[in-house]
């Protein structure tokens, strides 16, 4: 299926582009300030999604191609199952084993006109995608890529500056602060001089205790999957993720970080559901704040994303900590 996608305003809010008339299935999520002039989302099922961070600039003529890979490892790449079982008119999700159904675009990314972004690609903060590029592999933060297939031709800044920007995370500042300092951003040296010192994150005793427990389990060979459930979403990706861990018998733990803004009645019902699991290894953390994510995610083996904007925030932390990123609707 192909739909046109556009979000040309610069609002300081999270915006979603839906792929259905009922506005229950999200195709694109944009963070604060980001805009998408015009493009197309070509997708193989309702699982498919594009996650865009904050203050990213996406030009016109963009193609997002997600969930449309055919199985090249079988005797034929022809979609026999879809044809013989009459699934073609149902927007069938083709071959989950060979598709990655989310694109993640970081913060402060600039994507030039007529670029094509393939499913499963993760574009790092500050990257520049040249006009007409075909991006089939991940793009590092602040890299400039061009061509088909897209290749890195340079980086916007030296390694030390990129590391500093990744720690600074100016895109997470309050809009008022960004507005007041944007003239300084025009002069990179002045900007670096003013904000060179980045405050050290203070870790609470609660976080330290949690870190120690996680480290003990990891020493015993356990793998941790970090997940913020989309409890207020109509799509309920959290149900799919929980089902993957409901009956695991190997050393895998789903660490569930409850969003701080969830209504208390929803939290209570979710907690009761977690407690009802007789098998599986699920851990529920109920005091989720930004600092908690920052001190816990670096200890994880994986994070699991949804279609919600908070997945962009945790993916950013995971990228800096070199933690692998999985999409909740993909097979893993």
Q: For the regions a protein language model found, what residue spans apply to each?
A:
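A generic "structured core" feature
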Residues: 128-130, 134, 208, 215
């Amino acid at each position: 299926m192909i739909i046109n996608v556009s979000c040309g305003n610069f609002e300081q809010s999270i915006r979603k582009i839906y792929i259905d008339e009922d506005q229950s299935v999200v195709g694109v999520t944009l963070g604060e300030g980001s805009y998408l002039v015009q493009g197309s989302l070509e997708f193989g099922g309702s699982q498919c999604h594009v996650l865009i961070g904050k203050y990213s600039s996406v030009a016109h003529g963009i193609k997002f191609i997600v969930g449309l890979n055919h199985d090249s490892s079988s005797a034929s790449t022809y979609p026999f199952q879809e044809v013989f079982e009459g699934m073609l008119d149902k927007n069938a999700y083709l071959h989950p084993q060979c598709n990655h159904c989310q694109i993640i675009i970081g913060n402060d990314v600039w994507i030039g006109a007529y670029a094509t972004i393939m499913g499963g690609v993760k574009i790092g903060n500050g990257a520049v995608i040249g006009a007409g590029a075909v991006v089939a592999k991940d793009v590092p933060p602040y890299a400039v890529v061009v061509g088909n297939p897209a290749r890195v031709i340079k980086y916007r800044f030296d390694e030390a500056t990129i590391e500093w920007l990744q720690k600074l995370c100016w895109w997470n500042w309050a809009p008022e602060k960004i507005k007041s300092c944007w003239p300084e951003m025009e002069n990179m040296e002045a900007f670096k001089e003013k904000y060179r010192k980045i405050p050290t994150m203070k870790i609470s005793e609660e976080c330290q205790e949690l870190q120690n427990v996680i480290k003990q389990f990891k020493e015993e060979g356990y793998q941790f999957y970090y997940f913020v459930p989309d409890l207020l979403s109509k799509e309920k990706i959290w149900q799919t993720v929980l089902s993957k861990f409901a009956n695991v018998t190997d050393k895998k733990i789903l660490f569930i970080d409850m969003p701080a803004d969830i209504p208390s009645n929803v939290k209570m019902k979710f907690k009761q559901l977690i407690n009802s699991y007789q098998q599986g290894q699920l851990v529920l953390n109920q005091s989720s704040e930004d600092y908690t994510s920052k001190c816990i995610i670096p200890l994880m083996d994986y994070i699991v994303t949804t279609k919600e904007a908070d997945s962009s925030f945790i993916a950013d932390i995971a990228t800096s900590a070199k933690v692998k990123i999985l999409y909740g609707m993909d097979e893993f």
